[in-house]
Design a protein with these regions (language model features):
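Secondary-structure edge/capping motif, primarily at the C-terminal ends of alpha-helices
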Residues: 88-92, 124-128, 190-197
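Short hydrophobic/aromatic patch on the recognition helix
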Residues: 52-63
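Short secondary-structure transition hinges
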Residues: 115-150, 163-174, 199-203
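Hydrophobic alpha-helical connector segments
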Residues: 72, 86-116, 138, 172, ...
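Alpha-helical DNA-contacting segments of helix-turn-helix folds
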Residues: 70-80, 120
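C-terminal peripheral helix-coil segments that are non-catalytic and often amphipathic
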Residues: 1-11, 149, 153-161, 185-257
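Helical hydrophobic small-molecule/effector-binding pocket
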Residues: 100-126, 146-153, 179-184
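Basic, helix-initiating cap at the start of DNA-binding domains
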Residues: 1-38, 42-51, 68-71
Length: 257
């Protein structure tokens, strides 16, 4: 489950184009392993070349810089997120449950791929974007737009069915952004700052702190059914059991080692 960087290959490629694509995917996979071991600061073009059967010049033929390589990793991360979010949005339940399923998917992704989940934000810093190729930035923008559209669709369905009232002063874009911000921040803290006093305290007193954060947010905008009227912990477990059983089992096994 973890570490998969496979990509859907476009059809109709020539043999040479396919070979170039395969080589690029191989180099991205090598870069991913370097990042997992040493973090983004440890990633260099020299290390990628040394771990491959290609010269540094060949690596530069595919990526204009280390930052361009980080952007390529980010497109892989976004592609994996989208695949998991699409599976989650097919969950059979009301639209708040579907949104919760997306949050479950993101929590799983962050546990399975901590390096890639951090890459999505790192790739948007000026230090990276200023040295990334236009092709790579365009790919990231396209994937981000696809991610946002998934959130927008759930919002629209919730409003159409009267589950959430969008006639107030808070626009749907703000609610979608708040969900992303809360999900990213909470998962980053639990995965990267687990020794923090605030994290330790909330884990000792709450069964599912991330779910509590989601409920605070969605109850705050009045998304029905409210958490006082519905068992969303049960929904969380159903998502794990019905949509992501393999990923959930992998994480449980990893934590028990």
């Amino acid at each position: 489950v973890s570490g998969s960087l496979s990509a859907t290959k476009p059809s109709g490629l020539t043999r040479k184009q396919q070979a170039l694509l395969d080589r690029e995917q191989e180099l991205i996979a090598i870069a991913f392993e370097v990042v997992k071991r040493e973090g983004f600061t440890g990633l260099t073009m020299d290390k990628v070349a040394a771990a491959s059967s290609y010269s540094k010049g060949t690596v530069y033929n595919h990526f204009t810089s280390k930052e361009d390589l980080i952007a390529a990793l980010a497109t892989k991360a976004l592609s994996q997120e989208i695949a998991m979010f699409k599976r989650a949005s097919a969950f059979k339940g009301n639209n708040r449950e579907k949104l919760l399923a997306v949050h479950v998917a993101y929590a799983l992704f962050c546990c399975l791929e901590p390096a890639l989940s951090n890459c999505v934000l790192s790739c948007r810093t000026p230090a990276v974007t200023e040295k990334s190729s236009e092709k790579r930035l365009a790919a990231m923008n396209s994937l981000e737009a696809e991610l946002l559209s998934l959130g927008d669709q759930i919002m629209e369905l919730g409003a159409a069915r009267g589950e959430v009232d969008m006639s107030g002063s808070i626009p749907a874009t703000s609610i979608v952004f708040a969900n992303w911000a809360m999900g990213f921040g909470a998962n980053a803290l639990f995965n990267s700052a687990s020794e923090s006093g605030a994290v330790v305290r909330v884990q000792e007193t709450c069964e599912n702190p991330i779910l509590d954060c989601i409920n605070l947010l969605l109850d705050g905008v009045g998304w029905k059914p409210l958490s006082t009227e519905f068992n969303y912990q049960e929904t969380w477990q159903r998502v794990l059991d019905e949509i992501f059983p393999e990923e959930a089992a992998f994480i449980r096994q990893s934590k028990s080692l």
